[in-house]
């Protein structure tokens, strides 16, 4: 796919939990719990108008769902701030220091005073209905590992409550995650390829993690991706679970927008105007149906409504993403608005046990070939679903609607809600502006020195190749590498990195289990000059539970020979072998027992 020709633009929003002693706006510990909660409270969302009289469209959307929100908490780690029954405390200073440091890493412009804002959140994940957020800096740019990264904004905000389950119209959240400090880094739109965007996302995330001030583990980093193409629209894709999925998500969203534009062109060519809400009860057409799907609804007292979709024949079944059709988009809207599980459309019928005769009967009753079937018990819900479908159909001639979507595990996306408007942000009235003091700036400058480029250069200076240094930075082993570097000072840094990255991986492919204790034992033996680097792989391969590297070396006859003995061997071999073949011959005869550096040293001494 020619992304440049498509005019592909991609933006990232990287959210990273910070490792602090308290939550951002209260003094509760930032720990997640799996034990039985001590209490539950119930809330519902209500629309409130902003000071300018505006209402956010995403709020209207969510309130229409009539959902109930249940929040679980603990008496010893949940407070009234999280329940929105007490004003917020002043923000955590450690989180502020980290946010300012990250702003400095990306050369962003800092504000002298930080204002706490309320950002409307409509999915129930914040008890108050809003998320407290602070804009720390804007307009940053940094060149890191060869990538020119423009940063629009850096914000410090509270994380949302953790979704536990969904019970019909009730959503259950746990308050343990609510309020954990979160840094949000939003990039400028980029013209990079999807694979390059993945690299940029990793660079941003790791730039924060490398400071040691970010949480680690599953769920501590979340990526949102904004995608648009020429003629399309900005689509925000929430919750891409893994960096490796980013290229696929971007590719599939570009494909989706291309295909939605094709549908718009075809509708214009056909002269399709506005679709009106026109439904008919076609339950009688399925009185003797053999379709299990339909029969299940009818047996529970339900009915089948058919919605006319004139001019959409062959377009409802038009594939817009791998395995997803335009009809899938309509079904997403139905699922988002109502409790219905989806819909059936004429382009996929006959099918699902519905016969050609039943399809003809429905088409004859409606007087159109293109239609959608909605099945359920509640008439009001069926009519609401029909209205939602009509609204989406009437967006189709315009091309790509602006939406917030969720990433699926295969890289495709599904509709969540309309994109929020400008009315979603307003000032926090319970907190004064926060001043960035000289002390905060001074501490942030020290943290900012620990950056990705500096770490890369440091590894190169230790003798690692560029590839090995980059591989180490990208791996989860960097902290261990630095720990071992300090602990085993006689072991060459490149050998430590090679053991952690290459040798361990090669042995794992053979089915050999390698853990930290085995690696430490090998490094200790290397540090004490008991074994050679040539013997490392064989020793790790043959190490038994509870056995030390030295014990394995003695059992296998791989104990390192003393230098004086190596020198005698080199003298003996040099009398029988051509000069250029001496090193190879010694290493062949005494493989794993002699160190190549000892052989080179002995050869140099003999020659002199």
Swiss-Prot record:
UniProt keyword annotation of Nucleotide-binding present: yes
Which one GO biological process term can you cite for this protein? translation
Top-rank lineage group of the source organism: Archaea
GO terms under cellular component:
cytoplasm
Key words, A-Z: ATP-binding, Ligase, Nucleotide-binding, Protein biosynthesis
The family database entries (InterPro entries) matched by this protein are listed as: Asn/Gln-tRNA_amidoTrfase_suB/E (IPR017959), Asn/Gln-tRNA_Trfase_suB/E_cat (IPR006075), Asn/Gln_amidotransferase (IPR018027), Asn/Gln_tRNA_amidoTrase-B-like (IPR003789), GAD-like_sf (IPR004115), GAD_dom (IPR029351), GatB_C_1 (IPR042114), GatE (IPR004414)
Q: Which reaction equations make up its catalytic activity?
A: L-glutamyl-tRNA(Gln) + L-glutamine + ATP + H2O = L-glutaminyl-tRNA(Gln) + L-glutamate + ADP + phosphate + H(+)
Task: Tell me yes or no: is Protein biosynthesis among this UniProt entry's keywords.
Answer: yes
EC number, as in UniProt: 6.3.5.-
Write out the GO MF terms: aminoacyl-tRNA ligase activity; ATP binding; glutaminyl-tRNA synthase (glutamine-hydrolyzing) activity
Task: Tell me which SUPFAM superfamilies the record gives.
Answer: GAD domain-like (SSF55261), GatB/YqeY motif (SSF89095), Glutamine synthetase/guanido kinase (SSF55931)
A Pfam cross-reference name: GatB_Yqey
Q: Which SMART domains match?
A: GatB_Yqey
Function (record text): Allows the formation of correctly charged Gln-tRNA(Gln) through the transamidation of misacylated Glu-tRNA(Gln) in organisms which lack glutaminyl-tRNA synthetase. The reaction takes place in the presence of glutamine and ATP through an activated gamma-phospho-Glu-tRNA(Gln). The GatDE system is specific for glutamate and does not act on aspartate.
Describe the protein's quaternary organization and the partners it interacts with.
Heterodimer of GatD and GatE.
Q: Which family does it belong to?
A: Belongs to the GatB/GatE family. GatE subfamily.
Q: What is this protein called?
A: Glutamyl-tRNA(Gln) amidotransferase subunit E
What is the organism of origin for this protein?
Answer: Pyrobaculum aerophilum (strain ATCC 51768 / DSM 7523 / JCM 9630 / CIP 104966 / NBRC 100827 / IM2)
Task: Print the organism lineage.
Answer: Archaea, Thermoproteota, Thermoprotei, Thermoproteales, Thermoproteaceae
**Name of the gene:** gatE
């Amino acid at each position: 796919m020619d992304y440049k020709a498509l005019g592909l633009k991609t933006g990232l929003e990287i959210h990273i939990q910070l490792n602090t002693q308290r939550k951002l706006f209260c003094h509760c510990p930032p720990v997640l719990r799996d034990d039985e909660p001590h209490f539950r409270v119930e809330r519902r969302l209500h629309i409130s108008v902003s000071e300018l009289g505006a209402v956010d469209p995403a709020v209207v959307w969510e309130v229409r769902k009539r959902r109930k929100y249940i929040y679980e908490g603990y008496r010893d780690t949940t407070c009234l701030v999280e329940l929105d029954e007490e004003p917020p405390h002043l923000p955590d200073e450690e989180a502020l220091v980290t946010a300012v440091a990250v702003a400095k890493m990306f050369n962003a412009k800092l504000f002298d005073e930080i204002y706490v804002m309320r950002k409307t959140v409509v999915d129930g994940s914040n008890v108050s209905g809003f998320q407290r957020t602070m804009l720390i800096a804007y307009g940053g740019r940094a060149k890191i590992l060869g990538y020119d990264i423009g940063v629009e904004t850096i914000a410090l905000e509270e994380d949302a409550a953790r979704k536990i389950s969904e019970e019909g119209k009730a959503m259950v959240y746990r308050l343990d995650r609510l309020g954990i400090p979160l840094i949000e880094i939003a990039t400028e739109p980029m013209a990079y390829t999807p694979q390059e965007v993945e690299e940029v996302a990793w660079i941003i995330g790791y730039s924060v993690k490398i400071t040691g001030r970010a949480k680690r583990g599953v769920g501590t980093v979340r990526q949102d991706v904004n995608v648009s193409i020429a003629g399309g629209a900005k689509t925000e894709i929430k919750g891409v679970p893994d960096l490796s999925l980013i290229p696929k998500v971007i590719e599939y969203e570009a494909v989706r927008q291309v295909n939605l534009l094709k549908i718009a062109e075809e509708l214009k060519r056909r002269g399709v105007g506005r679709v009106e809400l026109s439904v008919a009860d076609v339950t009688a057409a399925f009185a003797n149906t053999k379709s299990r799907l339909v029969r299940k609804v009818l047996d529970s007292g339900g009915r089948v409504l058919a919605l006319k979709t004139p001019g959409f024949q062959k377009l409802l079944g038009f594939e817009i993403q791998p395995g997803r059709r335009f009809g899938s988009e309509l079904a997403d809207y139905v699922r988002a608005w109502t409790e219905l599980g989806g819909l059936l459309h004429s382009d996929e019928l006959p099918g699902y046990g519905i016969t050609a005769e039943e399809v003809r009967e429905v088409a004859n009753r409606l007087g159109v070939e293109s239609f959608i079937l909605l099945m359920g018990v509640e008439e009001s819900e069926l009519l609401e679903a029909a209205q939602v479908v009509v609204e989406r159909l009437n967006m189709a001639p315009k091309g790509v609607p602006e939406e917030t979507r969720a990433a699926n595990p295969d890289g495709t996306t599904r509709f969540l809600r309309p994109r929020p408007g400008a009315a979603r942000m307003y000032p926090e009235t319970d907190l004064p502006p926060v001043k960035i003091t000289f002390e905060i700036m001074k501490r942030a400058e020290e943290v900012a020195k620990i950056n990705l480029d500096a770490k890369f250069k440091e590894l190169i200076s230790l003798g690692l190749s560029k590839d090995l240094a980059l591989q180490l930075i990208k791996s989860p082993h960097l902290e261990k590498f630095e720990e071992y570097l300090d602990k085993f000072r006689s072991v060459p840094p490149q050998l430590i990195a090679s053991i952690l990255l290459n040798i361990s991986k090669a042995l794992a492919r053979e089915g050999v289990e390698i853990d930290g204790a085995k690696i430490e034992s090998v490094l200790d033996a290397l540090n004490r000059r008991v074994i050679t680097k040539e013997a490392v792989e064989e020793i790790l391969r043959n190490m038994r539970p509870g056995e030390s590297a030295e014990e394995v070396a003695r059992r296998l006859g791989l104990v390192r020979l003393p230098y004086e003995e190596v020198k005698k061997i080199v003298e003996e071999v040099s009398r029988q072998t051509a000069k250029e073949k001496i090193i190879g011959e010694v290493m062949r005869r005494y493989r794993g027992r002699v160190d190549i550096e000892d052989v080179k040293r002995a050869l140099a001494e003999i020659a002199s």
